[in-house]
Swiss-Prot record:
Reported function: Involved in oxygen transport from the lung to the various peripheral tissues.
Primary gene name: HBA
Modified residues (Phosphoserine): 4, 36, 50, 103, 125, 132, 139
Record's protein name: Hemoglobin subunit alpha
InterPro entries for this protein: Globin, Globin-like_sf, Globin/Proto, Hemoglobin_a-typ, Hemoglobin_oxygen_transport, Hemoglobin_pi
Subunit structure: Heterotetramer of two alpha chains and two beta chains.
GO BP: any one term: hydrogen peroxide catabolic process
Binding site for heme b: 88
Residue ranges of domain Globin in the record: 2-142
Organism: Chlorocebus aethiops
Tissue: Red blood cells.
Length: 142
């Protein structure tokens, strides 16, 4: 999916508003995913998946850091996320549909925390961005 200059601007501005809350929002999105789509828990059998767990917070920070990297390299996400794509495809073997589920939960989390900034245009841009990230992360599956 091609991001327009307006999409890139919207994504960078929205992610800039996330600021120091990125890890917190990442963890919240994971919790939403585990509650809404319980089958996603199977990839985390060794985690304490309870609300506020240190492991979920830690993984939420990893998710947020990866998204921050993607935002910073929006014009070259395949290169920037190559190692992460390898990890998920070859070692973790995550079902690609789970990226879409997490993307949805991230959108809900961002909308809940940034209602003024979450305009229809920003929503559409973030959705396209997360779909692009998902495409990059699943590219090594083929």
């Amino acid at each position: 999916m091609v991001l327009s200059p307006a999409d890139k601007s919207n994504v960078k501005a929205a992610w800039g508003k996330v600021g120091g809350h990125a890890g917190e929002y990442g963890a919240e999105a994971l919790e939403r995913m585990f509650l809404s789509f319980p089958t996603t828990k199977t990839y985390f059998p060794h985690f304490d998946l309870s609300h506020g767990s240190a492991q979920v917070k830690g993984h939420g920070k990893k998710v947020a850091d990866a998204l921050t990297l993607a935002v910073g390299h929006v014009d070259d996400m395949p290169h920037a996320l190559s190692a992460l794509s390898d990890l998920h495809a070859h070692k973790l073997r995550v079902d690609p549909v789970n990226f879409k589920l997490l993307s949805h939960c991230l959108l809900v989390t961002l909308a809940a925390h940034l209602p003024a900034e979450f305009t229809p245009a920003v929503h559409a841009s973030l959705d396209k961005f997360l779909a692009s990230v998902s495409t990059v992360l699943t590219s090594k599956y083929r």
